[in-house]
């Protein structure tokens, strides 16, 4: 079974100003003359971490990572102004041009898969391959499954902690109830809601619970960006024209090679998502990992993703 490549240090990092407000942190790792790949983190709002550098062979790939608007080391932190899917798609292009890259592989999981599909469908000529994990397409049923009722029946203990910050009278629409608190003028209200929202996803992302991983979701800096930006996208339907837009426009990536990796026991983003995508994008190979959940860092998901990136060099 394949594991992550060894730790790697960026050979370059910087800040890209994408408008009058947003400044995005980016970094490059691996071989400056290697095959380019851009890594798209999840959330939206989670930001990149050092382990995300390690799915690609650093001797063969030029690995580009960046923190999306409001996330991680990008500023202003947790900001929702001009923060939409299509702003992020445009940011990816601005970064590609700024780095002098003609075409690149696009790698992303969870929300990163959403953004990767949106980017590739908008800029297929700049996309050499897609490597996707934990498919998420922001359809209404997906949001209701995880944030209203569905996953709640599998993790009732974590669910009770998630809904504790919302009065019973508001629990018929939890995404909206959290939105009111995450955009509150009161800092304590925002933080309490952000930590509850963030911990819910942390508690459900792995087949076998990882307490350190769960605890990381309670960090105030992480939780505020993660929860505020995620919720902002969800109340706006991902800023898509129609909820099945990524499936509707799949013909735009029909000729792009791809690999879809999805955990059989992914509770956050059910396997149905990958199945639906594969049916309209048969050129991609679908790898269902039989002993994994949602997290990219579960052993079987790591194995499948590293095998996928190796196959393209």
UniProtKB/Swiss-Prot annotation:
UniProt keyword Iron, yes or no: no
Catalytic reaction(s) noted: Release of N-terminal proline from a peptide
Active site: 110, 266, 294
UniProt domain AB hydrolase-1: residue ranges: 35-298
InterPro entries: AB_hydrolase_1, AB_hydrolase_fold, Peptidase_S33, Pro_iminopeptidase
GO molecular function, one term: aminopeptidase activity
Main location: cytoplasm
Keyword annotations from UniProtKB, A to Z: Aminopeptidase, Cytoplasm, Hydrolase, Protease
Enzyme category, top tier: hydrolase
Function: Specifically catalyzes the removal of N-terminal proline residues from peptides.
Family of the protein in this entry: Belongs to the peptidase S33 family.
PANTHER family xrefs: PROLINE IMINOPEPTIDASE
Protein's UniProt name: Proline iminopeptidase
Organism of this sequence: Xylella fastidiosa (strain 9a5c)
């Amino acid at each position: 079974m394949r594991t992550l490549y060894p730790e790697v240090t960026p050979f370059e990092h910087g800040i890209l100003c994408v408008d009058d407000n947003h400044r995005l942190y980016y970094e490059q790792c691996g071989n400056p003359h290697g095959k380019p790949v851009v890594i798209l983190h999840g959330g939206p709002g989670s930001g990149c971490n050092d382990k995300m550098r390690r799915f690609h062979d650093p001797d063969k790939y030029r690995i580009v990572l960046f923190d999306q608007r409001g996330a991680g080391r990008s500023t202003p932190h947790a900001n929702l102004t001009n923060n939409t899917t299509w702003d992020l798609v445009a940011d990816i292009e601005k970064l590609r041009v700024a780095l002098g890259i003609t075409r690149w592989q696009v790698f992303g999981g969870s929300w990163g898969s959403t953004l990767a599909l949106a980017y590739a469908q908008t800029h297929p000529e700049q996309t050499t391959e897609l490597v996707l994990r934990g498919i998420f397409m922001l359809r209404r049923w997906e949001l209701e499954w995880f944030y209203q009722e569905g996953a709640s029946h599998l993790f009732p203990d974590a669910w009770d902690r998630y809904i504790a910050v919302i009065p019973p009278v508001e629990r018929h629409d939890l995404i909206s109830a959290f939105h009111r608190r995450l955009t509150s003028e009161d800092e304590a209200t925002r933080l309490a809601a952000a930590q509850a929202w963030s911990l819910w996803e942390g508690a459900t992302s792995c087949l076998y619970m990882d307490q350190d991983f769960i605890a990381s979701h309670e960090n105030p800096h992480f939780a505020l960006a993660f929860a505020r930006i995620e919720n902002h996208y969800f109340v706006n339907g991902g800023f898509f024209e129609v909820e099945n837009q990524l499936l509707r426009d799949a013909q735009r990536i029909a000729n792009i090679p791809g690999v879809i990796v999805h955990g059989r026991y992914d509770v956050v983003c059910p396997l149905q998502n990958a199945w639906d995508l594969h049916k309209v994008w048969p050129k991609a190979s679908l790898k269902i990992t039989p002993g994994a959940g949602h997290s990219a860092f579960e052993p079987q998901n790591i194995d499948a993703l590293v095998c996928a990136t190796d196959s393209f060099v």
